């Protein structure tokens, strides 16, 4: 799968709270910023689940809708909804061409969902995707490791995205953070 430009999504669970942050930049091709304030992180299922996407915007909206339908079908069971979405995404000839990745989380767990059928739960309660994902991941791991009670999940998520935005040209400082307690 090619690298996705135009976004960074970061999710963290820390001290009993969960937060996900995403920047607002949408890049057309490799040279033009089309939008600065896109909302790529959203609460779903009556505010009990947060989902964030990296990749093609139209593809991601399709996946958001499909994932939300799976959440409803499986009564909010995050793992089951994610696995069923990944199975359908991977096996359907049309859906297989969608170019996006999702991070989904509730108060208890978080998962990376991809079109190649992967559903991955991290060992350390941190996930990041998109063009600035590795920068945000490194910053987030350092912050979480040394934060103790001085930083909450929301602060770690915001600071990780800010760091990625300072390094990655496809990530801006128009950050949206959603939090679960």
From Swiss-Prot:
It is found in: Cytoplasm. One of its GO terms (cellular component) is HslUV protease complex. Gene3D superfamilies: Glutamine Phosphoribosylpyrophosphate, subunit 1, domain 1. It is an enzyme of class 3 (hydrolase). The keyword Hydrolase applies. GO terms for molecular function: metal ion binding; serine-type peptidase activity; threonine-type endopeptidase activity. The keyword Protease applies. One of its GO terms (biological process) is proteolysis involved in protein catabolic process. Keywords: Cytoplasm, Hydrolase, Metal-binding, Protease, Serine protease, Sodium. InterPro entries: ATP-dep_Prtase_HsIV_su (IPR022281), Ntn_hydrolases_N (IPR029055), Proteasome_sua/b (IPR001353), Proteasome_suB-type (IPR023333). Its EC number is 3.4.21.-. Transmembrane segments: none annotated. Its main location: cytoplasm. The active site is at residue 2. NCBIfam families: ATP_dep_HslV, PRK05456.1. Belongs to the peptidase T1B family. HslV subfamily. Protease subunit of a proteasome-like degradation complex. A double ring-shaped homohexamer of ClpQ is capped on each side by a ring-shaped ClpY homohexamer. The assembly of the ClpQ/ClpY complex is dependent on binding of ATP. This is ATP-dependent protease subunit ClpQ. It comes from Bacillus licheniformis (strain ATCC 14580 / DSM 13 / JCM 2505 / CCUG 7422 / NBRC 12200 / NCIMB 9375 / NCTC 10341 / NRRL NRS-1264 / Gibson 46). The lineage of its organism: Bacteria, Bacillati, Bacillota, Bacilli, Bacillales. The gene is clpQ.
């Amino acid at each position: 799968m090619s690298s996705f430009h135009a976004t960074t999504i970061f999710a963290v669970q820390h001290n009993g709270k969960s937060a996900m942050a995403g920047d607002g930049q949408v890049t057309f091709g490799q040279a033009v910023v089309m939008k600065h304030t896109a909302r790529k992180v959203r609460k779903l299922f009556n505010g009990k689940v947060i989902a964030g996407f990296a990749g093609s915007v139209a593809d991601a909206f399709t996946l958001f809708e499909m994932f939300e339908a799976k959440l409803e079908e499986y009564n909010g069971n995050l793992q089951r909804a994610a696995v069923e979405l990944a199975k359908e995404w991977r096996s359907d000839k049309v859906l297989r061409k969608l170019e996006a990745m999702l991070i989904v989380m509730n108060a208890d767990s978080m998962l990376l969902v991809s079109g190649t059928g992967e559903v991955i739960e991290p060992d350390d309660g941190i996930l990041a995707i998109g063009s600035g994902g590795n920068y945000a991941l490194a910053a987030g791991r350092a912050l979480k490791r040394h934060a103790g009670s001085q930083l909450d999940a929301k602060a770690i998520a915001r600071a990780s995205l800010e760091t990625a935005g300072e390094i990655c040209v496809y990530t801006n400082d128009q950050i949206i953070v959603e939090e679960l307690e």
